[in-house]
Curated annotation (Swiss-Prot):
HAMAP family for the chain: RNApol_bact_RpoB (MF_01321)
Keyword line: DNA-directed RNA polymerase, Nucleotidyltransferase, Transcription, Transferase
InterPro entries listed in its UniProt record: DNA-dir_RNA_pol_bsu_ext_1_sf, DNA-dir_RNA_pol_bsu_external_1, DNA-dir_RNA_pol_su2, DNA-dir_RNAP_su2_dom, DNA-dir_RNAP_su2_hyb_sf, RNA_pol_bsu_bac, RNA_pol_bsu_CS, RNA_pol_bsu_protrusion
Function: DNA-dependent RNA polymerase catalyzes the transcription of DNA into RNA using the four ribonucleoside triphosphates as substrates.
Organism phylogeny: Bacteria, Pseudomonadati, Pseudomonadota, Gammaproteobacteria, Pasteurellales
EC top class named in words: transferase
Protein name: DNA-directed RNA polymerase subunit beta
Keyword Transcription annotated: yes
Amino acid sequence: MVYSYTEKKRIRKSFGKRPQVLNVPYLLTIQLDSFDKFIQRDPDGQQGLEAAFRSIFPIVSNNGNTELQYVSYQLGEPVFDVRECQIRGTTYAASLRVKLRLVSYDKDAASGTIKDIKEQEVYMGEIPLMTSNGTFVINGTERVVVSQLHRSPGVFFDSDKGKTHSSGKVLYNARIIPYRGSWLDFEFDPKDNLYARIDRRRKLPATIILRALNYTTEEILDLFFDKVSFEIKDNKLLMTLVPERLRGETASFDIEANGKVYIERGRRITARHIKALEKDKITQVEVPTEYIVGKVSAKDYVDLTTGEIICPANMEISLELLEKLSQAGYKNIETLFTNDLDFGPYISETLRVDPSYDRLSALVEIYRMMRPGEPPTKEAAEGLFDNLFFSSERYDLSAVGRMKFNRSLGIEDTTGSGTLSKEDIVNVMRKLIDIRNGRGEVDDIDHLGNRRIRSVGEMAENQFRIGLVRVERAVKERLSLGDLESVTPQDLINAKPISAAVKEFFGSSQLSQFMDQNNPLSEVTHKRRISALGPGGLTRERAGFEVRDVHATHYGRVCPIETPEGPNIGLINSLSVYARTNDYGFLETPYRKVVNGQVTEEIEYLSAIEEGKYVIAQANSNLDGELRFTDAFVTCRGEHGESGLYRPEEIHYMDVSTQQVVSVAAALIPFLEHDDANRALMGANMQRQAVPTLRADKPLVGTGMEKPVALDSGVAVVAKRGGTIQYVDASRIVVKVNEDETIAGEAGIDIYNLIKYTRSNQNTCINQIPCVQLGEPIERGEILADGPSTDLGELALGQNMRVAFMPWNGYNFEDSMLVSERVVQEDRFTTIHIQELSCVARDTKLGSEEITADIPNVGEAALSKLDESGIVYIGAEVKGGDILVGKVTPKGETQLTPEEKLLRAIFGEKASDVKDSSLRVPNGTSGTVIDVQVFTRDGVEKDKRALEIEEMQLKQAKKDLVEELEILEAGLFARVRNLLLSGGFNDKQLENLDRTQWLEQTLVDEDKQNQLEQLAEQYEELRKDFEHKLEIKRSKIIQGDDLAPGVLKVVKVYLAVKRQIQPGDKMAGRHGNKGVISKINPVEDMPYDENGQPVDIVLNPLGVPSRMNIGQILETHLGLAAKGIGDQINAMIKQKQDVEKLRGYIQKAYDLGDGSQKVDLSTFTDEEVLRLAKNLRKGMPLATPVFDGAHEKEIKALLELGGLPTSGQITLFDGRTGEKFERPVTVGYMYMLKLNHLVDDKMHARSTGSYSLVTQQPLGGKAQFGGQRFGEMEVWALEAYGAAYTLQEMLTVKSDDVNGRTKMYKNIVGGTHQMDPGTPESFNVIMKEIRSLGINIDLDEE
């Protein structure tokens, strides 16, 4: 494999045996692609904004004289970039302008001649844009729109599994679900009548729907039944015989023909009998007259002389009727063919309970059910029914729905109209009846072929369409009002409803969520999340067990491991690594095609629907050099997802990768295959809660997924183009782009500004640190700067800790951990947390609030950290209760007398009419002020601090641009210099001239002169561009801010807190092995090995066997081996050994095992080998891919190479006594994470605080500065001990005895320690409650 310069700095050795066939795809595709489809112009108008516009426009007025047509749309450029929007608290959005055409026609002209056309661009609100990382910035905060897994539109056949009716009878039902519009359900009741429901309302006999579709009784029976015809001949009754229909029946009379008895009476009819009848070609058989009694007529029989109906369709035939029919001259009588087994009389029975008799009565019934209480008219009833399923405005199956509908009914063509047709409804009823008759299967709702993904773009389009529909109504009204001479499209359209609908979706939809920004992994996972909840989805209370369960079709599409614990389990899932959505929104996963037992290079994506037809081999099947299966039988997933053994020639496809099944977070767990699923789930979830540490440390034992996650998360800076590093400092990297990658006529310089110490959504710290050095060559797509939790472009969520599995004095009881003080000293788990506190000055009724340092009744000490504007200075160390921003609010309770007004006017006594409402540091918080921002409303005078900040920003912006210009100029003048030197000038001449004069020289060579003139033009362009950019920056910085109504000024203060690890903090490994730190032990007390090296963490060995997460033990062993090799390399470097020896040793380590990754160090220069060795000193990074990891023998070999015992166990000594422990202990390196559950955020103690209004008891919870609840059971405990006085104190003065507690407070302050409890307030409450019941209750004093 060829490594680039940066990749050679540190190579992760992989134990993966299978070569990588398909690279891990870009992980945020699902978000970015979906949104791109939404905003790009789709020429077919099938999706996105274009589709929404085309579905609503043209809007025609009610009289048809005018129409508003849609021409095209365009999105503007956002005013502020993403970073500026976050700082200012605005939405990152672009304005939408739509070109509309208002056409008016002549009233009298029948042909519709056009009278007038007005075309105009209309503003239609703002559309939030997606950032390059798949997020949205809404009101300054980053949000993610989670994709939804919802039931695909189409038709579904289901049964109640015998749960509805007490008899346990299985009732079948069918449901037609459109993308938008009314649902239509068909269902059987326990009496086997077929009913229909519209929108889950009251049920109606299903035949009402058929009658409303204009079918007569005769046509209905014709659609659903086969006929049996009887002939009356010579007073005999002959029945046309279809032998196949007789199977399984019992003959109720002798079946004979031509004098031969084929079947005797009372005998069961078998296949042998049928064969005999078919052989002799018997087509008619004589039946006794009684046989026809009870059969049902298939059509109306009319008396031809009188026109009177003798026997209507669907009537049971009796002997009298038969007599009448034969008298009327009917020789042939048709009846319905039914039997109890597989041709039930359901529709015929339903027609009997159907109250309607023709189309109109059916429509009236439907109208009454949909609009109870309204008087039906013929027009209204027809209009309602047509609009329900046959109007494209109200009903749309969508392309997906039509495809699923046709597939379900076995129709070849998967395209068609978005509305239903008569045939569609009849076909659904037919299939439902077939299923009831035992032919066909019900659908599996949880199959991923019946559930589809609805992503951001689609949801945004739906919201946008809702907004457009609201506008459409208003436009229609306006068009109908007449007087359209002076009206322009701009006057007709109000953008408010549109922007309100879009804003509502992005701001408050259940699926638009505050981004989880703990670390890069949590960001990536959040964007790849798939939720079954949300509008149009399930609710967690109603979701049963089946929906939440892992389904066979999840394989390679949805991760079976990663899902939250708790009420949402199984409803929120994560996309598998390689999964993607197809055009219809169904999840697909890639497979390698197999032809005749030979695996090809071809890769195909299959959806769950297609996958069911094939046999698919697993990724770990053994292949030979020619990619043929070596085993006679291969474990595969066959039809319907059942696994079994198949011959190689029966196999159609093979998995692409062993990681195909799991999601990104689960693919980061090494030795996942050795962990119990429940613990793996916790491990995957807890990695998302890891807080980025001060110094990121790559995992010694990884899985190879660390790099793609870090790159795709967007937290690191990636090179846009290759080149050389020209300048680097903590906040900026400049790259001189390679000649072949520059565009003609540009300077070829890329400047990357880094993000420094900013706050994430979870209050963790986002900071980028350069990881390249001056002069280094880089390639496109390489990492230039590490973000939070990344180390040399690899995800690094925690730290590698030396752990020992052994009990230690009970300090690791029940998952606690004993941590060495060295971990604290080295700041291994120190994290930075940044909090934003804001102070808002509003305009109140009594006057405006003011931000000032002049605060009434506050001592000098409290103001010591404020500047003259009343705002805290940067760098101040503050603690709970300190003032950050001084603010006073006018108070105006008192009406002043004229005398007082005069005095106040003379002496300017101001303190009395304002109250202090300053922003203070919340209790329990302390930290350093790292940044202050002041936002002032347009037209309000800026204070001194705001001007200072503005000045600083202008300086910084100018400095940035000047530096950029200098770098670009240097590049340009370098080219000018080369040109002049080649054109006859020498160095000395050029040095005597000013650089700008170089451009004025003339060269003899015409070609070179032209080049020089071009460069001079470029120089001018650069200067102009610089001025222009500076002006834009300046206007952005100087302009007032767009604040909420009534807000004059906002001051935001950022506090940074450095949190070291301490007892009570929660830590975890990657295998679901979580615990709380019980004690931080001095280094000298920790167990140490014979080299005197102490361990960092002592874990409890009893936490492993019962939890069955053995992966952590294997990780520990492999980590020890990795460290051992690092130690060996370190020793060789320290001894200054020969580079060749070093190269040999490292090569040996990379070659160990039979992995597919080959590292050839012979192509590395000595310098590169040394750099690599230096980076491997702390341990050699290893990768053990999921389900394809290191084997035990490889771990042992690696331990041996590192000069360590192959058992992975070491003799330890007690740090306090120096004695040996009685048996060897498993010691190694485990990757530990510090989770965002810090004791500082949870611990809390109340002094005197606020009380609840009604009960007067202290509030609860840290946020309310509440107390600890002394509940019912605690009271019982004190009662049991007979601690009467303690109990009395608890129930009165410490709780809700108002007078008692004030008295007590005074006593304590006064130094007298006595209490006299009074009546608790809650006693008064109960008295009031009893009085409210009308019972008078009084307390009599004795």
